[in-house]
């Protein structure tokens, strides 16, 4: 008969009572991460009316207590209307500015609500092998506030034909809808 192939005895440590070092980071940062809804005017052939229809979703990070949100340009590209999703509620926003070359956009929440702002990190302190925590809204509202974890795989990556320079590479799961979210 085959012998047991699972770890046992003194080599096995229990995780009972152990706390994740990621949980504190997530608890602090998650309220600063919002969903971003890109809506465009679309003609409805049945009703004969023009309607705002969601054409893309992504994520963003609140960077000031005045409601400024940083996201990716490709998340808001072509939008006639942009809203952010915070704590289950859509908030009206305006596009403050964007840069197609760096794929960045800044939004401002137009409603009088308090949104906590994230404390930005220093990219110069990031090293290959450091943990990477991604917080975002993969696939939109249904999966809002999703967390994935990986490591920083490389720094200063450049893609041939890309206008974005000095990218950070991670192996953390990033899905459609995470664009613009917290890393």
Locate each region found by the language model.
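Serine-dependent protease modules
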Residues: 3-183
């Amino acid at each position: 008969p085959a012998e047991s192939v699972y770890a046992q005895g003194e080599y096995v440590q229990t995780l009972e009572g152990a706390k994740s070092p990621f949980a504190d980071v997530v608890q602090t940062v998650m309220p600063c991460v919002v969903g971003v809804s890109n809506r465009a005017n679309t003609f409805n052939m049945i009703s004969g009316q023009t309607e705002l229809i969601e054409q893309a979703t992504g994520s963003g990070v609140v960077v000031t207590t005045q409601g400024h949100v940083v996201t990716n340009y490709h998340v808001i590209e072509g939008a006639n209307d942009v809203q952010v999703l915070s704590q289950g509620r859509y908030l009206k926003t305006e596009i403050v500015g964007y840069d197609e070359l760096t794929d960045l956009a800044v939004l401002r929440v137009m409603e009088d609500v308090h949104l906590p702002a994230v404390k930005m990190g220093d990219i110069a302190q990031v090293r290959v092998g450091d943990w990477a925590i991604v917080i975002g809204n993969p696939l939109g509202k249904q999966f809002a506030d999703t967390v994935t974890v990986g490591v920083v795989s490389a720094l200063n990556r450049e893609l041939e034909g890309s206008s974005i320079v000095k990218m950070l590479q991670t192996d953390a799961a990033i899905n459609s809808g995470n664009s613009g979210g917290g890393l």
